[in-house]
From Swiss-Prot:
The gene is glsA2. Its EC number is 3.5.1.2. PANTHER family: GLUTAMINASE (PTHR12544:SF29). GO terms for molecular function: glutaminase activity. It comes from Bradyrhizobium diazoefficiens (strain JCM 10833 / BCRC 13528 / IAM 13628 / NBRC 14792 / USDA 110). This is Glutaminase 2.
C-alpha cells in the first residue's frame, strides 16, 4: 500500500443559476471522490474464499449518514456484498450486551495483535488478542452461542438488522464457500476450545461465525450502522436505541486500535476515525456525534483493506479535518450569556413601585444561558463560573433551551454544584426544560433533592418567577385580585379626578373568566381596555406570549394607532376591566383636546419605555 499522501479531490463549485444549489457541498465532495478514485484498479480480489473472487472489481459505492439521519449515496451504494469482518465490531457489541463486559473481558483481550488477522495465536494468558481478529470474533460468537444455542445466529442477524435499520439476509453461496474452505478458522476454533474459550460444540459456533460473515449488506447499510455507533447507539434513520452508549464507547475503542487489520496504526495516524474493514470490500467508519461512513469496493491492498475505500476515508478526513484527536472545542463557548436583569425584564409588565424594586435589586437575579451539548469539560467550566465568580446573586437562573444533551459526567458535576448552591441559600431555577426532557432527567437524578430546584419550560417564565420573589421579599407584592383605581393607569397619568371620571363615564365594565379570550388577533380594533383586577396575557397567534399584564395596566391601546388587532389577549385569572370604545374616545378628544394630548403623551412614553427595554435586550444579546 502506497503510504504517501494522496491527492485530494477539490469541492467543485455548482453552476450558478436562479434558486438554491441543487446539491449540498458534502454530496458534491463525495461525488468528486467517486470520480477521482474509481479509475484506480490497483489491488486484488480476495481469493482465499473462492466465492469472493467472483466479485465485480469495478463496483464502487460510497454512503454517508449524518446523526440527524440524512443519507448521502454515490455510485454502487445499493449493491449487496457480504459483510465479512466488518461484522466483528457489531457482534462484539452484541456479546457485551448479551453476557456483560466482565465475561467478555475475561475471554477476549483488547490489545492489537501485531500479526495477521487470521493468526493462530493467543495471548500469554490464552485469550484472543482482541475481538477484531478472527480468534476474538469466533470467541464472541461462542459467547453468544452459550446463551442462545441454535438461536445464536438469528440473534446476530437480528441485531445487525437493527443497526442497519432493515432486515438483512445471508448469501448462502458465500456461506457454503467459507464453510468448505475455512480450515484455518477451524484450527483457531479448536485452539480456543483447547483452552476452554469455546464450548464443546465447536462446529456449531463456527457455523454462527461463517454465517455472520456471509450476511449481505450495502454501502448504505454500513453507513447507517456506523452512524448508529456515532449517535451513541441510536439508529438515526429509525430512531431506535440499538445498543447502549457504554457499549458503543467500548466498541469504538477496539475499532480504533485494531479495526483495520495490521494497517490500524497507519489508519489512526492518517484518518483518525474508528473503523472496521472486511475482505468483502467494505469499510465502516464512525465519527462520534457527527457521521457514519460506509464504502464498498472489492479490490484489496496487501493489508486486505479496500483500496478505493481507504482513499475515500483519507480524503474525507483530510478535507474536513475529521481526525478524532484534532478537536478544537473551547469550553468557554458553552456559556452563551451571563447577566442580571438590569435594563431588562420578563414579559410581565410591572407597576411603578414594583419596577423600582427590580431596578434597585437587579443584581439579585443572575441569568446564565448555556449552549451546546454539555460534557465533563464544559460543565467543569460552567460550575467554576457559577461558584467562583461574582456576583453571588441569591436567585440563579440557568437556561438550557439551547442544550440538546448532557453526559452523565456533566450531569454529575452539575448536580453536585446545584446541591452546594442550595446549601448556600441560593435559589436555583432551571429554564428551557420540559418535564420529559432527558437533560432534566439526568440533572434531577444527580441532585440531592430535585424538589429544591425550580424548573420552567420558558426562560421568560423563570425570570418572571424570580422577579416575583424579589418584589415579595422587599414589600412590593401586589394582589392581582384587588381592584386598582383608574388614576393609577399609566395611560391616564396626570389626569385629574374630573378627567378620569369622564373617561369612566364613556367606558363599560367587563368581566372575563380565566382562559377566556378578551381580544382576538385580526379583529377590528375599536376599543381599548383598562385592567382593574386580575391578569391577562398578550399572545401571538402562534401562542408565543408577548406580555403579561396586571391591575393598573392598559391593553389594546394600539387601537389608537392601528385599526386591526395584532395579537390575542386572554384572561389568565378572573378579570375586571373597563372598555373604552374608540368612537367615544374620538368624541372625547374633540371636546377635551388638552386631556387627549396628555393621554397621547402618556402613550408615547409607554411605547418609548418598551422600545428602550427591547433595545436593552438586543444590546445584551449582541454583547455575547
Amino acid at each position: 500500500m502506497d503510504t504517501q499522501p494522496i491527492r485530494l479531490p477539490s469541492v467543485a463549485g455548482a453552476t450558478r443559476s436562479a434558486g438554491y444549489p441543487t446539491r449540498p457541498p458534502l454530496r458534491r465532495f463525495l461525488t468528486d471522490c467517486h470520480e477521482e478514485f474509481r479509475g484506480d484498479s490497483s489491488g486484488e480480489l480476495a481469493d482465499y474464499i473462492p466465492e469472493l473472487k467472483r466479485a465485480n472489481p469495478d463496483h464502487f459505492g460510497i454512503a454517508l449518514v449524518t446523526i440527524d439521519g440524512h443519507v448521502y449515496e454515490v455510485g454502487d451504494s445499493a449493491v449487496p456484498f457480504t459483510i465479512q469482518s466488518v461484522s466483528k465490531a457489531f457482534v462484539f457489541a452484541l456479546a457485551l450486551e448479551t453476557v456483560g463486559e466482565e465475561r467478555v473481558s475475561a475471554t477476549i483481550g483488547v490489545e492489537p495483535s501485531g500479526e495477521a488477522f487470521n493468526s493462530i495465536r493467543l495471548t500469554n494468558d490464552n485469550r484472543p488478542f482482541n475481538p477484531m481478529v478472527n480468534a476474538g470474533a469466533i470467541a464472541c460468537s461462542g459467547l453468544i452461542y452459550e446463551v442462545d444455542g441454535k438461536g445464536a445466529f438469528e440473534r446476530v442477524r437480528s441485531k445487525l438488522s437493527e443497526f442497519a435499520g432493515r432486515e438483512l439476509g445471508v448469501d448462502e453461496a458465500v456461506h457454503a464457500s467459507e464453510t468448505a474452505t475455512g480450515n484455518r478458522n477451524r484450527a483457531i476454533a479448536w485452539l480456543l476450545r483447547n483452552y476452554a474459550v469455546l464450548p464443546d460444540d465447536v462446529d456449531a459456533v463456527l457455523d454462527v461465525y461463517f454465517r455472520q460473515c456471509a450476511i449481505l449488506v450495502t454501502a448504505r447499510d454500513l453507513a447507517v450502522m456506523a452512524a448508529t455507533l456515532a449517535n451513541r447507539g441510536i439508529n438515526p434513520v429509525t430512531g431506535a436505541q440499538v445498543i447502549t452508549p457504554h457499549i458503543v464507547a467500548r466498541t469504538l475503542s477496539v475499532m480504533t486500535s485494531s479495526g483495520m487489520y495490521d494497517y490500524a496504526g497507519e489508519w489512526t495516524y492518517r484518518v483518525g476515525i474508528p473503523a472496521k474493514s472486511g475482505v468483502g470490500g467494505g469499510i465502516v467508519a464512525a465519527l462520534p456525534s457527527q457521521l457514519g461512513l460506509g464504502t464498498f469496493s472489492p479490490l484489496l491492498d496487501n493489508h486486505f483493506n479496500s483500496v478505493r475505500g481507504l482513499k475515500v476515508c483519507e480524503a474525507l478526513s483530510a478535507r474536513f479535518d475529521l481526525h478524532m484527536l484534532n478537536r478544537n472545542a473551547d469550553v468557554r463557548t458553552s456559556v452563551m450569556a451571563d447577566y442580571d436583569v438590569y435594563g431588562i425584564s420578563s414579559r410581565r409588565s410591572r407597576q411603578p413601585h414594583e419596577q423600582q424594586i427590580l431596578d434597585e435589586r437587579h443584581s439579585d437575579i443572575r441569568i446564565v444561558e448555556l449552549v451546546g451539548a454539555l460534557n465533563f469539560g464544559t460543565i467543569d467550566y460552567v460550575t467554576r463560573r457559577l461558584t467562583s465568580e461574582p456576583p453571588n446573586a441569591p436567585l440563579l437562573i440557568i437556561d438550557f433551551r439551547r442544550v440538546p444533551d448532557i453526559t452523565a459526567a456533566g450531569a454529575e458535576l452539575l448536580g453536585e454544584t446545584l446541591t452546594a448552591l442550595g446549601n448556600a441559600n441560593v435559589t436555583t431555577i432551571l429554564s428551557g426544560l420540559e418535564e420529559a426532557s432527558a437533560v432534566w432527567a439526568a440533572i434531577a437524578a444527580r441532585t440531592g433533592d430535585p424538589r429544591r430546584l425550580r424548573r420552567f419550560a420558558l426562560l421568560d417564565d423563570a425570570i418572571e418567577w424570580a422577579e416575583d420573589q424579589v418584589i415579595y421579599r422587599f414589600g412590593g407584592f401586589t394582589d392581582v385580585k384587588e381592584s386598582v383605581h383608574l388614576g393609577e393607569q399609566a395611560l391616564l397619568a396626570e389626569l385629574d379626578t374630573d378627567e378620569i371620571a369622564a373617561i369612566v363615564k364613556l367606558s363599560t365594565t367587563r368581566h372575563y373568566t380565566a382562559g377566556q379570550r378578551v381580544i382576538a388577533a385580526g379583529a377590528p380594533a375599536n376599543s381599548l381596555f383598562f385592567l382593574q383586577s386580575g391578569m391577562v396575557s398578550v399572545k401571538l397567534r402562534s401562542g408565543v406570549r408577548l406580555a403579561s399584564l396586571g391591575p393598573g395596566m392598559e391593553f389594546g391601546e394600539m387601537a389608537i394607532l392601528e385599526r386591526t388587532r395584532s395579537a390575542d389577549v386572554f384572561a389568565d385569572t378572573p378579570v375586571a376591566c373597563l372598555e373604552l370604545p374608540l368612537d367615544s374616545f374620538a368624541d372625547y378628544r374633540r371636546l377635551h383636546p388638552e386631556t387627549a394630548l396628555k393621554i397621547m403623551r402618556n402613550l408615547a412614553a409607554i411605547l418609548a419605555r418598551r422600545l428602550v427595554a427591547a433595545n436593552a435586550k438586543v444590546d445584551l444579546l449582541s454583547a455575547y
